[in-house]
Amino acid sequence: MAAAAQSRVVRVLSMSRSAITAIATSVCHGPPCRQLHHALMPHGKGGRSSVSGIVATVFGATGFLGRYVVNHLGRMGSQVIIPYRCDKYDIMHLRPMGDLGQLLFLEWDARDKDSIRRVVQHSNVVINLIGRDWETKNYDFEDVFVKIPQAIAQLSKEAGVEKFIHVSHLNANIKSSSRYLRNKAVGEKVVRDAFPEAIIIKPSDIFGREDRFLNSFASMHRFGPIPLGSLGWKTVKQPVYVVDVSKGIVNAVKDPDANGKSFAFVGPSRYLLFHLVKYIFAVAHRLFLPFPLPLFAYRWVARVFEISPFEPWITRDKVERMHITDMKLPHLPGLEDLGIQATPLELKAIEVLRRHRTYRWLSAEIEDVKPAKTVNI
């Protein structure tokens, strides 16, 4: 009986060793096993349903440029945190730009550091698009372009954010006659001091459907003759398309070599202000009647709009900016360095200006309009 039991044990042990050997052989020579859980891997069909690995906080997402940046981030499968101070109905247009659960809306206070810390603490990318065309009793240009960006940059650095992108202006200069541009220049410096690896974007005047550039000039037809300082013969502009700026920002997020650099985003052509406004009115099929208005008189007119209780159509500072020639910064990288071909104004102007046409010309083609004359100065 004992011998039989012993033989049975031996047979069991021998079978166990062979089974182990077979299992080991199948493991070594079989298909490789997945080592990561599927939830950790990028998945989906691509586009908004994919996972890019980017978690971006976009300050100023409710503005003109912000909607394009959020859309480009959302269409590549990024999670976007959108701080807002406005009414909830003013952010409804952003909700379809990302997949379910990919857009997170958080109320914030621009002067509360705890509020800022809360919206950046889980992000690996922070983009600052905060801007204002005119000062208010609550926020002047120093608040908007210096103090708030400085606080965001400092708290982003403390939170361990990998990428910080700050949008300034091509003509930012501490010696500028425009208070707007002087504060933009100071803002660049304080952001660079707080976050040395920050990426600073310096776009020229941006045009697009919701802009305050082409639309602002086109709306002058309501006042009859068009006032221009020195008739616009002394000012050169190089506007850039909003989609190009948005793509450039997103490409800078993905570019590992962009950290710590400043980029100048400009359009492919430079125009005298006179020729540019003339082209705007030609596309809108409006009568162009320019007349020279001295800048001091232009400022008086702007002051009247500033004291009105409504959104000012023009301000004294905007008069200054409108008549400042766009700088050439060949030492800075641009859109081409981020893989983007700048879009000519003539290809997209109709998208902006069609709504300024009368019913008679609403469906007219753009081919009957001569392109604006370009300059090389």
UniProtKB/Swiss-Prot annotation:
Pfam families for this protein: Epimerase
Modified residues (N6-acetyllysine): K189, K370
Modification type N6-succinyllysine: residues: K175
Cofactor binding description: Binds 1 FAD per subunit.
One GO BP annotation of this record: ubiquinone biosynthetic process
UniProt PTM comment: Acetylated on lysine residues. BLOC1S1 is required for acetylation. Acetylated by CLOCK in a circadian manner.
Transit peptide, residues from-to: 1-35
Requisite cofactors: FAD
Entry keyword annotation includes Acetylation: yes
Keywords: Acetylation, Electron transport, FAD, Flavoprotein, Mitochondrion, Respiratory chain, Transit peptide, Transport
Cellular component terms (Gene Ontology): mitochondrial inner membrane; mitochondrial matrix; mitochondrion; respiratory chain complex I
Molecular-function annotations in GO: NADH dehydrogenase activity; protein-containing complex binding
Recorded superkingdom: Eukaryota
Subcellular location: Mitochondrion matrix
Membership in a protein family: Belongs to the complex I NDUFA9 subunit family.
Subunit structure: Complex I is composed of 45 different subunits. This a component of the hydrophobic protein fraction. Interacts with BLOC1S1. Interacts with SLC2A4. Interacts with CLOCK. Interacts with RAB5IF.
Function: Accessory subunit of the mitochondrial membrane respiratory chain NADH dehydrogenase (Complex I), that is believed not to be involved in catalysis. Complex I functions in the transfer of electrons from NADH to the respiratory chain. The immediate electron acceptor for the enzyme is believed to be ubiquinone.
Protein name as it appears in the record: NADH dehydrogenase [ubiquinone] 1 alpha subcomplex subunit 9, mitochondrial
